Amino acid sequence: MRLIYVSMEDCKRTVFPYIHKNLTSNEMAPVYETDTQGMSDLGKILQFVMNDDYYPTFSDKTSYLLCSLAGAQYFVNGNKRVGVVVILRFLEINNVHLSALTEQQFQTILSIAFPAHAWEHNRHIRNPHAAFLYNLAIVIGDKARWGTNDFSQLKERVAALFEHSYFVE
């Protein structure tokens, strides 16, 4: 399957507006486009994920995107939200099918991979998959919940979670 990648234009046209419209009721998001360094760093991530030598599988690519974006401080605020929405966009433009799991099943999967994390319910997130990504982004953003200090091991764990969650045609 030939993958379609999220571009900077996608971020400006789709990702950032989605965040501002739907994910700012509890905490404001910055105007991402005005952060020159953050936008530059985001662009590098979006380019590097295309490298099949480093990220040969869909799960590897998805893991790299989420871990790199949610686990960094490229922007003053909203890095986890950018990571989650970029992943959702990546899934959407590639017509990826999700495992039909309940929120409880996603909780169980996440607790096995990251036992130090207690599932956080967000009343604004009703979709089980979105709740899973939200909680996974929280784990990635907090090294104390990883169970390791090794970023490569974190990416491998996240890739394994994604292998069982997404079906690429």
Segments predicted by a language model, with ranges:
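FIC/Doc superfamily catalytic core
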Residues: 1-169
